[in-house]
């Protein structure tokens, strides 16, 4: 009499199959986790570069509209100095044109006093409501970029670059802005000043 053996998996075969499945699942999970981490890092980098680009757009818009007009009571057309105006590095201040006032609806000029400074590792844009700020008038502060460890300026005039600007009677012809930004490094940009001589 022949006996029919039952066919099936042995305990050892089942354990081996479970171990292989667990190893494959763990590998797939680690790959997925790595992809998600890389995606998150890429998103952070894109966000940082977008913030950096936005800061340079503000600088370009302001430098492109510089006009040679000092504020009342001050003879300086253009102010740039280190460790002034509560800045941890360079600060800069000037008059710009082109502040939008559609059809003159708002009770203000199209001229605006603006400035930039580095404070608490943040690049800040300073703007004033009045063309000639009153004594004690606080600027409107807009944080353009965070985690900035350096804000450096150089000035171009008469065919050469200068590390400081002491000429109170005219504007530079160009400005180089260098920022040292966390997760990005040092970034420099050159800006052409359209009005290099007083009109």
From Swiss-Prot:
Alphabetized InterPro entries for the sequence: N_methyl_site, Pilin-like, T2SS_protein-GspJ, T2SS_protein_J
Keywords carried by this UniProt record: Cell inner membrane, Cell membrane, Membrane, Methylation, Transmembrane, Transmembrane helix
One GO cellular component, as annotated: plasma membrane
Residue ranges crossing the lipid bilayer per the database entry: 9-29
Propeptide: 1-8
Known partners and oligomeric status: Type II secretion is composed of four main components: the outer membrane complex, the inner membrane complex, the cytoplasmic secretion ATPase and the periplasm-spanning pseudopilus. Interacts with core component PulG.
Protein name, as recorded: Type II secretion system protein J
Organism lineage string: Bacteria, Pseudomonadati, Pseudomonadota, Gammaproteobacteria, Enterobacterales
């Amino acid at each position: 009499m022949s006996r029919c053996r039952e066919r099936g998996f042995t305990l050892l075969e089942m354990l081996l199959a479970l171990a292989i499945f667990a190893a494959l699942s763990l590998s797939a999970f680690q790959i997925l986790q790595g992809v998600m981490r890389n995606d998150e890092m890429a998103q952070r980098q894109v966000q940082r570069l977008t913030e950096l680009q936005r800061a340079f757009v503000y600088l370009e818009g302001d430098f492109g509209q510089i006009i040679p007009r000092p504020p009342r009571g001050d003879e300086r057309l253009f102010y740039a100095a280190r460790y002034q105006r509560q800045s941890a590095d360079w600060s800069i201040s000037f008059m710009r044109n082109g502040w939008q006032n559609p059809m003159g609806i708002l009770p203000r000029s199209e001229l605006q006093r603006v400035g930039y400074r580095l404070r608490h590792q943040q690049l800040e844009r300073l703007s004033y409501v009045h063309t000639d700020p009153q004594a004690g008038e606080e600027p409107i502060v807009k944080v353009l970029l965070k985690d900035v460890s350096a804000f450096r300026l150089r000035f171009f005039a008469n065919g050469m670059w200068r590390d400081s600007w002491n000429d109170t009677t005219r504007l530079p012809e160009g400005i180089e802005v260098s920022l040292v930004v966390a997760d990005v490094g040092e970034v420099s940009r050159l800006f052409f000043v359209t009005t290099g001589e007083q009109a």
